[in-house]
C-alpha cells in the first residue's frame, strides 16, 4: 500500500473541506474573491485526492507483482 498515495488522498480531502468552508463564507458575506478561492481550493483538493488514488493503485499493483 502506498503511504504517499494515502497521504495525498487525505491532504486532498482536507483541501476540499477548506474550500467548501471558504466558498460558503464567501457566499454568505457576498465576498466573490473568497468564494472563488474556495472553489479553487476544492478543485485542487479533488485533483490531489485523485492523484493519491492513482498512486495507491500503482503501488498496490507493483506490490502484487513482487
From Swiss-Prot:
Top-level taxon: Bacteria
SUPFAM superfamilies recorded: Hypothetical protein YjbJ
Regions of compositional bias (Basic and acidic residues) in chain numbering: 13-22
Family to which the UniProt record says this protein belongs: Belongs to the UPF0337 (CsbD) family.
A Pfam family it matches: CsbD
Family matches, as InterPro entries: CsbD, UPF0337_stress_rsp, YjbJ_sf
Location of the region described as Disordered in the Swiss-Prot/TrEMBL record: 1-22
Species, as recorded: Bacillus cereus (strain ATCC 14579 / DSM 31 / CCUG 7414 / JCM 2152 / NBRC 15305 / NCIMB 9373 / NCTC 2599 / NRRL B-3711)
Coiled coil region boundaries: none
Protein name, entry field: UPF0337 protein BC_0999
Amino acid at each position: 500500500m502506498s503511504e504517499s498515495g494515502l497521504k495525498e488522498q487525505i491532504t486532498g480531502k482536507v483541501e476540499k473541506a477548506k474550500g467548501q468552508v471558504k466558498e460558503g463564507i464567501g457566499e454568505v458575506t457576498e465576498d466573490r474573491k473568497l468564494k472563488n478561492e474556495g472553489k479553487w481550493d476544492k478543485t485542487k483538493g479533488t485533483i490531489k485526492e485523485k492523484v493519491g488514488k492513482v498512486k495507491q493503485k500503482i503501488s498496490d499493483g507493483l506490490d502484487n507483482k513482487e
